Amino acid sequence: MKRLAVWFAVFGGLLTTPVWAALKPGDAAPDFTAQAAVGGKDFTFSLSDALKRGPVVLYFYPKSFTRGCTIEAHEFAEAAASFAEAGATLIGMSKDPIEVQRDFSTQECRDKFPVAADPSLSVIHAYDALRVGVTASGETVSDRISYVIAPEGTVLYSYVDPKPDKHIENTLAVVRQWHEQHKN
């Protein structure tokens, strides 16, 4: 029994290691539409429609209402006005169903930006954001990956880190740089 516990401690963590195979700058960003919620209200988010207004920051997170994902949502909410000033649309996405995203959009995103539901994992797969293996609770979830997508539909930037710390800072810097280069 002790050996089994040691084996799980050593190798069990490998089940949730990220794939690190995110799309790279210059790659085409797969177009998608998804059910989303902002301020507790449902709507259909279309990447192609959002790109008509400027760059899109699309961030994937493992699960709504978990510690790291809540921290990340709070930080994106605090920076939402800065993203908008730079002309960017901000949207988060996880595999959680729309019923969960409705509450998350109000409670944790503070009505500042939408979160999309991808229970089929189709968008998560298309963006190489699926975590390899399953969580300790047996769920398949996305990795924590942030993308900045240019209006022409290509990836400007991708950032993969299981910690939420730098996702907001890094994507906002890229969006601001894009905005400076595309004034007028």
Label every model-predicted segment.
Residues 5-16:
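Bacterial N-terminal signal peptides
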Residues 20-184:
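Chalcogenol-based redox active-site neighborhoods
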